[in-house]
């Protein structure tokens, strides 16, 4: 039902400030989940099970982190047919993020620019929200560092968040690729990444012993990487036996949107313009890691054909964000059906 109404809703939402529309939508989805009205949103999406990271996904099309930073609308979002939900990014302490305005639509390019800056209510509130959700499907919890934590002490923030979210996560994503937290992408460097992943894997094993379950770790990387950087990241993922990698986050490049309104705004660009760059990183990364580190492909998916292209490049699963904002819930079913068709062909 909601899928058919979304074009009308979008017309109204797109007349609003982008962040105001975002919050309004989240509040509505959160209320629907809390009151049991989520069933009215339910989308008819066929099952297309896939096992990745030792987890069985209802279908291979998930929601990317960033839409629901605090995990406040999990049940409402789950009703839209996603095979898995990822929420966050969350940091140890609450923080307001960057000053507004900080989210901009580029409709001519079917894109968004954001410089949100990990705005969230902190990991303690995040965990309460996750615990309150009734959703029992695959839930990824995405963690980051506070803006005022020196980059040299970033590992402390990730380790703290990992310990707090671990009991409630199907998998945990380590976000080191947002362009909106100063120096964060330095953690993608070979030495920094090696040290961070070593600490996280050690913590993961100790938490697995404590809780009696191994929760997989996924690393989220940027599209703005050269061939050598992709190779180094691939080698590091293999060496530390990281369970998955999410490719990719937003881009700093403006090559595809030059001259458009808001194109010069600072922040990460997402949507259709990042599709090719994301796919290229997926292809190169898959050449390095093969099937030993499953890739979750995200960036610029606006159709079932786009979703299949991610899998053809080497991804095992896909996630939606900006395409979902522009296309609505109908995109989820379209992607699942396209992937199922190609798989059976």
Swiss-Prot record:
Subcellular locations according to the entry: Cell membrane
Domain of life of the organism encoding this protein: Bacteria
Cellular compartments per GO CC: cytoplasm; plasma membrane
Catalytic reaction annotation: (S)-dihydroorotate + a quinone = orotate + a quinol
Pathway named in the protein's UniProt entry: Pyrimidine metabolism; UMP biosynthesis via de novo pathway; orotate from (S)-dihydroorotate (quinone route): step 1/1
NCBIfam families per record: PRK05286.1-1, PRK05286.1-2, PRK05286.1-4, PRK05286.2-5, pyrD_sub2
Protein name, entry field: Dihydroorotate dehydrogenase (quinone)
Gene name linked to the record: pyrD
């Amino acid at each position: 039902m909601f899928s058919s109404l979304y074009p009308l809703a979008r017309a109204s939402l797109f007349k609003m400030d982008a962040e105001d529309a975002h919050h309004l939508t989240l509040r509505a989805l959160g209320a629907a989940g809390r009151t049991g009205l989520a069933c009215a949103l339910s989308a008819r999406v066929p099952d297309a099970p896939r096992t990745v990271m030792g987890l069985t996904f209802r279908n291979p099309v998930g929601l990317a982190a960033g839409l629901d930073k605090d995990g406040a609308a999990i049940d409402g979002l789950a009703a839209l047919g996603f095979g898995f939900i990822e929420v966050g990014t969350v940091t140890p302490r609450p923080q307001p993020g960057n000053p507004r305005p900080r989210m901009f639509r580029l409709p001519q390019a079917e894109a968004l620019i954001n410089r949100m800056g990990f705005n969230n209510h902190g990991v303690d509130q995040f965990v309460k929200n996750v615990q309150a959700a009734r959703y029992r499907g695959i839930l990824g919890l995405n963690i980051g560092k506070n803006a005022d934590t020196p980059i040299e002490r970033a590992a402390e923030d990730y380790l703290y968040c990992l310990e707090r979210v671990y009991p409630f996560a199907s998998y945990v994503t380590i976000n080191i690729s947002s362009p909106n937290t100063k120096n964060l992408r330095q953690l993608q460097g070979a030495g920094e990444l090696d040290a961070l992943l070593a600490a996280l894997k050690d913590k993961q094993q100790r938490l697995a012993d404590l809780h009696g379950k191994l929760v997989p770790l996924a690393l989220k990387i940027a599209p703005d990487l050269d061939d050598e950087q992709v190779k180094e990241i691939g080698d590091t993922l293999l060496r530390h036996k990281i369970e998955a990698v999410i490719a990719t986050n937003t881009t700093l490049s403006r090559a595809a949107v030059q001259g458009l309104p808001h194109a010069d705004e600072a922040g990460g660009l997402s949507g259709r313009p990042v599709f090719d760059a994301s796919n290229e990183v997926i292809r190169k990364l898959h050449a390095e890691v093969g099937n030993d580190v499953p890739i979750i492909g995200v960036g610029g998916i606006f159709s079932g054909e786009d979703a299949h292209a991610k899998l053809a490049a080497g991804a095992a699963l896909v996630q939606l964000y900006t395409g979902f904002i522009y296309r609505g819930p109908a995109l989820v079913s379209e992607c699942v059906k396209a992937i199922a068709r190609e798989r059976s062909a």
